[in-house]
């Protein structure tokens, strides 16, 4: 049909790589100069990663590693209504799967969270687990976590040896989302000098966020210190000491487990004017955002769903441009923007 075009598109680019944590791994200028001694000939010191290293068997490891794949499938339809107007509509789905590694200290751990997560602390390189060549010593972490290196019970008069599991582990902070959406744009050329655009944008997003233990780093189990922060009034499981001190292993979830939901509806319109040396536009948009969460860690099934928060936003913008010649022009733009806050650290106090 000459008036209709239909296209199905699918693409994705899986990626995985080591990474350096942002502000947490930041070093002072003098400290960056100090790490030059660790770099091989020809390698710039800015490529130094404080958490990249090896275990005692030469296996590479890093508490900062990222794996993600976010393929998108879209169905596009273009309808040429007449010689002046058209309607373009796209329905799409995006299924993101992946994680970024982070470190987590265990119950009564004497090791700093920043030592393993960032390899640095307040701009200074951490040497708690540092080899002479500057790489991170995961072998030393594994020894510290092993049953062969027990700590002493501070509550015992005899200071009996006790084993409290891994004092540091690596978790995969997972972000698995399903995102569905539809956009549609109507275009009409009212006259030789006027173009009109209007459209809608509807989206639904569900993101599953948890921290899955992926490496016990030489230990036999892990006791999640975060469980002590869970209130029994919110989650009845917290009333059971066996739950608070449960011995977790690879594949178990620690310190966070929730789903985030976002529903967005929006509409917009724009009118453009072009004649001789003048061009101008005026546009407006309106949107409404619905946010809610379902928490499975800090709350039980009856209390896990939050209230649904709604935010109305929109924009009004206008502008004009005058072209004096091909080298010079003058323009002015004015506008007002109102936007909804982000889901995490905005609509809700924190990400967990």
What is the predicted function of each stretch?
Residues 22-40, 104-114, 212-223, 228, ...:
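Flexible, surface-exposed loop regions and adjacent strand-edge segments
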Residues 32, 42-54, 62-68, 72-73, ...:
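Bulky hydrophobic/aromatic packing residues
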Residues 1, 58-63, 72-76, 167-172, ...:
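Extracellular loop and loop/strand-boundary signature of outer-membrane beta-barrel proteins
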Residues 149-187, 192-193, 212-216, 285-289, ...:
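N-terminal start-of-domain structural block
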Residues 1-20, 67-106, 174-211, 311-326, ...:
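Transmembrane beta-barrel strand/turn architecture of Gram-negative outer membrane proteins
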Residues 5-76, 101-171, 235-246:
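Acidic/polar loop-and-plug regions of large Gram-negative outer-membrane beta-barrel proteins
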Residues 189-195, 201-205, 218, 233-243, ...:
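Structural signature of Gram-negative outer-membrane beta-barrels, strongest in the C-terminal barrel
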Residues 1-10, 19-57, 224-237, 272, ...:
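Charged/polar interaction segments and conserved charged motifs
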